[in-house]
């Protein structure tokens, strides 16, 4: 999936430390550290930390 995030949280530090908390069957394409729960369907989230948030995935929000 394309690199996007609907639930991104950042610290108030400078620079900020941001992490996407979206959960889905896969992680986005730019994720380097993806963790998936052993469930069906899989529940995965990306543990990468960045200094920014990706654009939202859901264009309706």
Swiss-Prot record:
The keyword ATP-binding does not apply. The record marks 12-13 as: Reactive bond for trypsin. It comes from the Eukaryota. GO terms for cellular component: extracellular region. GO terms for molecular function: serine-type endopeptidase inhibitor activity. The lineage of its organism: Eukaryota, Viridiplantae, Streptophyta, Embryophyta, Tracheophyta. It comes from Erythrina variegata (Indian coral tree). This is Bowman-Birk type proteinase inhibitor. It holds the Pfam family Bowman-Birk_leg. Disulfide bonds join 4-57, 5-20, 8-53, 10-18, 27-34, 31-46, 36-44. SMART domains: BowB (SM00269). InterPro entries: Bowman-Birk_prot_inh, Prot_inh_BBI. Belongs to the Bowman-Birk serine protease inhibitor family. Strong inhibitor of trypsin with a 1:1 stoichiometry. Weaker inhibitor of chymotrypsin. Keywords: Disulfide bond, Protease inhibitor, Serine protease inhibitor. The record marks 38-39 as: Reactive bond for chymotrypsin.
